[in-house]
Amino acid sequence: MISYLASIFLLATVSAVPSGRVEVVFPSVETSRSGVKTVKFTALDQDVELKLRSAGEILGKRFAIQDVDVESLRRKIYRDSVNGAALLIDEDGPLTIEGIVNSKLRIQPFESGRITKDGIIAHQIVEVIDDKKSYDRVAVIPENVKRNAENVSRMARDDDCIVVEYYIVTDSAFTKRFKSNSALTNYVTVMFTGVQNLMDTLELGIGVRLLGVTTFTEKTEPSFIKDNLIPGPPAAFDPDVLISAMSKYYCNHQTGLAKDTDLIFLITARGMGDPREDGTVDINTAGIANSAGVCKPCFKSGIATDDSDYNERVDTLAHESVHLLGSPHDGEGPNLVSLEGSPGAANCPAKAGYIMGNRNDKNKYKFSPCTKKCVEYLLSKPTASCIFQQCTDF
């Protein structure tokens, strides 16, 4: 049986609760000859102008999910990495826009859908605020696994591209929030388009790809979910137990997308935290992942909670992804990285406020120089070979 050392860190996270500030707008969209879309509107004291480029590559070439028109979805994905925008723009009928405008604003078609101005339907802008803190955890892989992980198939070539492929599974609580697979896939696509924006701040040329999504229901949830749910109330998980069980499950079920992918993420709408003696759970954990687990069949798992409608956990998914890519929290040394020789992040204090630290307004949507060095170190090792692909392959 594999045992883990869990590193726990206080992580400021956005809880996507409306601040009370909501405004109806009629956004304009212009498309240049190069395909760049300019979206403009004024809302909540902000003049917003986004320069959006197609981001259809977020969906892998063979991405598929039941009842979803993948090629149609691919054409609708746009992002502005400078402003952190991740949007689905549908111009097949009346213009609709949904997704992340920036760190504080979200956009979606107005509920009635009947209000129009100059042929443009009304959209709702919602402001989200940071209203709580929660813990993040990282499971440190034992020493014997660290040493054995270097035995992989091939080294990267100089002309390869760095592409991190994700397989997403959702628990029944997350799945039933959505009316259809299409609505869930739209949400997850926006989420990982936002993750790509944050990965860009590493300036390492890392691409994000979704290979597929499996939406579990109460009837189809695998044992690692069912057997480890604490009834509560509310029903919740012990994150350390769940990540261990998930890792073991996929270690023993290396087939299909679970075998092909670089990372497997569970998205749950249930909470995670520390069990109390009375059978309830202190909900305090946003996410957990295995340290430097990328490309390791038995350790490439991560978990993120998401219990709202406004895609507030993009930062959590990026944070957990970077744990899997070899970075500890800012302020932590190499002893908390499951990769021999890692530089660690002790030279970057948590109070500097980056994504892997305690996050302040200046730096909370960027990674620290130490995080970049840790990820660069992992990329230099043969253990990371699975995320290097020939640039013509995607």
Curated annotation (Swiss-Prot):
Among the GO biological process terms of this entry, one is:
membrane protein ectodomain proteolysis
What does the UniProt cofactor note say?
Answer: Binds 1 zinc ion per subunit.
Q: Which Gene3D superfamilies match?
A: Collagenase (Catalytic Domain)
Activity regulation per the record? Answer: Inhibited by EDTA.
Proregion residues excised on maturation: 17-157
EC numbers for this chain: 3.4.24.-
What's the name of the protein? Answer: Venom metalloproteinase antarease TserMP_A
